[in-house]
């Protein structure tokens, strides 16, 4: 983690994309903190797309199609929901400078959402950054059981179909490890990232 940017700092979209291209991403200590930190972990979380695992119980649920899955229809709704405290996380790292920066990336076509809807209501989702053949997962949320997990499955299917090579989760959690997430050393990650940036995929 590096020194913070000045309070209220606006992160230019081009700077943010360059940061991702070098393996760096921004975070805040909490939603009300005006400062942003650049982060470059020594161990990086990824989900190998060819080894993605769907738990048996979730496969059964997927066959029932409990939610309507949409893409890129409500970015504001998704990032706002990701920024809300929940039972799993009392604090969020999404502050106002980060919210503004990723909204600008979405307008440029470099940020995407996967959304779970039921009866016209957004009940789960995730968002992330697309660059070259790499997708950087940022955050997810659920307002109904398994909604974000179903979005993750649909994300991986879409990345495979679009020719992506790398799904970066930044860190690993017990939840993500159930789907095949692993940690890789920074040097190895940077090699994988460089390869993924050589060509372009389609989200």
From Swiss-Prot:
One of its GO terms (molecular function) is leucyl-tRNA--protein transferase activity. It catalyses: N-terminal L-lysyl-[protein] + L-leucyl-tRNA(Leu) = N-terminal L-leucyl-L-lysyl-[protein] + tRNA(Leu) + H(+); N-terminal L-arginyl-[protein] + L-leucyl-tRNA(Leu) = N-terminal L-leucyl-L-arginyl-[protein] + tRNA(Leu) + H(+); L-phenylalanyl-tRNA(Phe) + an N-terminal L-alpha-aminoacyl-[protein] = an N-terminal L-phenylalanyl-L-alpha-aminoacyl-[protein] + tRNA(Phe). Pfam families: Leu_Phe_trans (PF03588). Keywords: Acyltransferase, Cytoplasm, Transferase. Its main location: cytoplasm. It is an enzyme of class 2 (transferase). GO terms for biological process: protein catabolic process. GO terms for cellular component: cytoplasm. It is found in: Cytoplasm. Its EC number is 2.3.2.6. SUPFAM superfamilies: Acyl-CoA N-acyltransferases (Nat). Functions in the N-end rule pathway of protein degradation where it conjugates Leu, Phe and, less efficiently, Met from aminoacyl-tRNAs to the N-termini of proteins containing an N-terminal arginine or lysine. NCBIfam families: aat. Belongs to the L/F-transferase family. HAMAP family: Leu_Phe_trans (MF_00688). This is Leucyl/phenylalanyl-tRNA--protein transferase. The gene is aat.
């Amino acid at each position: 983690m590096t020194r913070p940017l000045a309070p209220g700092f606006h992160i230019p979209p081009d700077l943010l994309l360059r940061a991702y291209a070098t393996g760096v991403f921004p975070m805040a200590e909490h939603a009300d903190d005006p400062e942003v930190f650049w982060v470059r972990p020594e161990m990086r979380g990824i989900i190998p797309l060819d080894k993605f695992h769907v738990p048996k119980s979730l496969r059964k649920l997927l066959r029932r199609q409990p939610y309507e899955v949409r893409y890129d229809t409500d970015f504001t709704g998704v990032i706002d929901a990701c920024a809300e405290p929940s039972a799993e996380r009392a604090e969020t790292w999404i502050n106002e400078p980060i919210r503004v920066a990723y909204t600008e990336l979405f307008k440029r076509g470099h940020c995407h959402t996967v959304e779970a809807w039921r009866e016209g209501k957004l009940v789960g989702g995730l968002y992330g950054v697309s660059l070259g053949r790499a997708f950087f997962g940022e955050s997810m949320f659920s307002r109904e059981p398994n909604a974000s997990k179903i979005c993750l499955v649909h994300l991986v299917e879409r990345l495979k179909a679009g020719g992506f090579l790398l799904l970066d989760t930044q860190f690993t959690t017990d939840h993500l490890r159930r789907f095949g997430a692993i940690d890789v050393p920074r040097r190895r990650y940077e090699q994988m990232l460089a390869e993924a940036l050589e060509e372009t995929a389609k989200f």
